[in-house]
């Protein structure tokens, strides 16, 4: 190994500038600085709770620099790690770098060991209330937002209807009777409680109970955020410029568990913005390994998986109790089910400002786009085909029909599990692609050239296990 130690040097947050600096090093030879700017008005917060969340991001974001040379020893100069926390970061690095091991032909069982430097495990609390939904630009986060808007009891302003009064019979009222009829009939305790709940719903909705947040890509995301129309929290992340320089030299490059970093960023945003729930949009298919390498399952979406989600929830539980919650609202759904719900609840509203494409964020553009050749474009077109009229769907790609593009046949064969492994990308399970293609073949007979098996009892609307709060499952998911 070129370097022996990866060093977590220190982190600093300036409440005036709202800038977090993270400092890392390799031996005494290299130093890196990464920054996060939280560009919004800060709420009152517990500085001790914030510091704990900052440490989590400090340790997680270091993976971008650690993976360049994979030093055998990790050294911590600032920040506390008890055994459970050290185990969490060790596992997340090791498993989250699965694709990295594969692409660079490294041992997929390479150990990553975070040192334990404390036996203390202190509980902090945050007083936040409300929902903080992540916006990534694609269909999944938009569906989450619309589901919360429509079904969560504290994100709607629809009042409880007044109980209708019986009509008076004509010619039977004296002047005394008429004065009595104008009085409000006393409401029952349950009706009063319902009205109180309606007022509370309206109050919370008006005060920003449901809000959104994002990391980077502000020019491209602004039209989408404006269309959503909710209070939004912007975060800007800046990598150390040496990352690109060293990647062009001798550093190793490859996929990192970016959603694990976003999970830690979201927790900080929740504390700084006075929110409780960090709501993500990771679906059931994120649990499926992309391929197997030297006997080890490799999952491109590991940090979107339920396994990571439950590990991170356990970390937050030890650190913050129930005062901060992290979960994915879409975990019970398959990708095809998500596409169906998105088509029904959100497509027409967002069709000209959303994109699930890998190349959506062109830095010289002020809007997102679709490339029409990447795995996510191909998969998105496939799963939306059964639920959106052809002309509307083709319009997203400038009139192009991706299913009929001969150049994309090899990619669709991968998605369908006909040839090779599934693409190393955020795409659905093979059986979901097959179910979507089966429906698409009813519209396009020319797609019958794709031959595959699909279990007769496969139900894409089946609800899968999830690790979300019970009230979200009951009040939102089961109401759709």
Question: Each predicted region: which residue ranges?
Answer:
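Alpha-helix capping and helix-loop boundary segments enriched in small/acidic/polar residues
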Residues: 250-257, 296-304, 326-333, 368-371
């Amino acid at each position: 190994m070129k370097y022996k130690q990866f060093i977590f040097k220190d982190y600093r947050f300036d409440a005036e500038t709202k800038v977090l600096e993270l400092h890392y090093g390799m031996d005494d030879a290299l130093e890196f600085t990464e920054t996060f700017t939280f560009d919004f008005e800060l709420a009152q917060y517990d500085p001790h709770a914030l510091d704990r969340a900052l440490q989590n991001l400090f340790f997680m974001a270091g993976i971008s620099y650690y993976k360049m040379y994979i030093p055998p020893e990790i050294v911590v100069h600032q920040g506390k790690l008890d055994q459970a926390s050290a185990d969490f970061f060790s596992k997340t690095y090791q498993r989250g770098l699965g694709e990295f091991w594969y692409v660079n032909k490294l041992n997929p069982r390479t150990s990553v060991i975070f040192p334990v430097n404390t036996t203390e495990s202190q509980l902090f609390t945050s007083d936040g209330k409300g929902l903080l939904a992540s916006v990534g630009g694609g269909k999944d986060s938009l569906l989450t937002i619309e589901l919360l808007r429509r079904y969560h009891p504290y994100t709607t302003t629809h009042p409880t209807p007044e109980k209708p009064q019986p009509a008076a019979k004509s010619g039977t009222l004296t002047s005394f009777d008429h004065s009595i009829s104008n009085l409000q009939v006393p409401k029952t305790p349950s009706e009063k409680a319902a009205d109180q709940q309606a007022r509370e719903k309206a109050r919370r909705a008006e005060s920003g109970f449901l809000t959104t947040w994002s990391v980077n890509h502000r020019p491209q995301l602004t039209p989408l955020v404006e269309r959503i129309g909710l209070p939004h929290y912007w975060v800007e992340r800046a990598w150390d410029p040496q990352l690109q320089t060293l990647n062009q030299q001798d550093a190793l490059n490859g996929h990192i568990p970016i959603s694990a970093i976003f999970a830690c960023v979201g927790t900080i945003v929740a504390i700084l913005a006075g929110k409780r729930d960090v709501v993500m949009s990771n679906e059931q298919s994120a649990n499926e390994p992309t391929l197997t390498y030297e006997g080890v399952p490799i999952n491109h979406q590991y940090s979107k998986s339920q396994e990571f989600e439950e590990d991170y929830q356990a970390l937050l539980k030890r650190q913050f109790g129930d005062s901060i919650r992290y979960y994915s609202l879409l975990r019970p759904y398959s990708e095809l089910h998500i596409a169906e719900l998105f088509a029904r609840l959100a497509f027409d509203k967002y069709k000209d400002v959303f994109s699930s494409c890998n190349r959506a964020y062109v830095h010289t553009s002020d809007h997102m786009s679709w490339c029409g050749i990447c795995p996510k474009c191909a998969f998105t077109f496939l799963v939306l085909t059964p639920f959106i009229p052809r002309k509307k769907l083709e319009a997203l790609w400038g009139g192009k029909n991706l299913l009929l593009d001969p150049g994309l046949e090899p990619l669709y064969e991968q998605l369908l599990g006909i040839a090779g492994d599934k693409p190393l990308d955020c795409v659905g399970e093979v059986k979901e692609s097959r179910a979507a293609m089966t429906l698409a073949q009813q519209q396009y007979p020319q797609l019958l050239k794709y031959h595959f098996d699909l279990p007769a009892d496969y139900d894409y609307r089946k609800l899968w296990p999830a690790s979300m709060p019970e009230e979200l499952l009951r009040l939102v998911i089961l109401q759709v």
